């Protein structure tokens, strides 16, 4: 299963057609009776269990091989990003990723998720990916549970993401629901020609 749901699709057109807008918006279900502290402690696989399986949990972009992350993006069908811009985005994001401890290359992610927001009220989850050879091992769930727990632990109450229909079920199992207020995401779109005209 490819974890492609949480990537932004602003202005992306697939080959042979126009991309339908908008993608479904999902929000973390805050209607439960659990406190932020209880949510922050709720992970299905502990860090020590992941370590025993050969995966180290990382909560910072420090040490992350951005080139290797870009390779994972490409293998799951995400567009490659300019590395310097990706580094800047990571500096302004909450990040959770898993490193393969057995790998000879330090900093290579096998699972990754990030969220950006105001740090107080709102966050949007982006770029949830799992290395294709590691899919089906619960690593996507592991990074998402930790990312949500970290955000909730900091008091962020509105956590949203945009999901492709084929992975909505995955996010529902993690506590996300279609936006209960029926707020719909919108995307600002400019064609490549419009972008070129404004930059020249």
Swiss-Prot record:
Recorded GO CC terms: chloroplast; cytoplasm
Inducing stimuli: Down-regulated by cadmium.
Annotated pathway: Aromatic compound metabolism; melatonin biosynthesis; melatonin from serotonin: step 1/2
Coiled coil feature spans: none
This protein's UniProt keywords: Acyltransferase, Chloroplast, Cytoplasm, Melatonin biosynthesis, Plastid, Transferase, Transit peptide
Broadest EC class assigned to this enzyme: transferase
Residues that span the membrane, as ranges: none
Top-rank lineage group of the source organism: Eukaryota
Recorded effect of pH on activity: Optimum pH is 8.8.
Subcellular location(s) per record: Cytoplasm; Plastid, Chloroplast
GO molecular function, one term: aralkylamine N-acetyltransferase activity
Function: Catalyzes the N-acetylation of serotonin into N-acetylserotonin, the penultimate step in the synthesis of melatonin. Catalyzes in vitro the N-acetylation of tryptamine to produce N-acetyltryptamine, 5-methoxytryptamine to produce melatonin and tyramine to produce N-acetyltyramine.
Catalyzed chemical reaction(s): serotonin + acetyl-CoA = N-acetylserotonin + CoA + H(+); tyramine + acetyl-CoA = N-acetyltyramine + CoA + H(+); tryptamine + acetyl-CoA = N-acetyltryptamine + CoA + H(+); 5-methoxytryptamine + acetyl-CoA = melatonin + CoA + H(+)
Pfam families in the cross-refs: Acetyltransf_1
Thermal dependence: Optimum temperature is 45 degrees Celsius.
InterPro entries (UniProt xref): Acyl_CoA_acyltransferase (IPR016181), GNAT_dom (IPR000182), NSI-like (IPR045039)
Annotated EC: 2.3.1.87
Transit peptide interval: 1-41
Record-annotated N-acetyltransferase domain positions: 55-195
Name recorded for this polypeptide: Serotonin N-acetyltransferase 2, chloroplastic
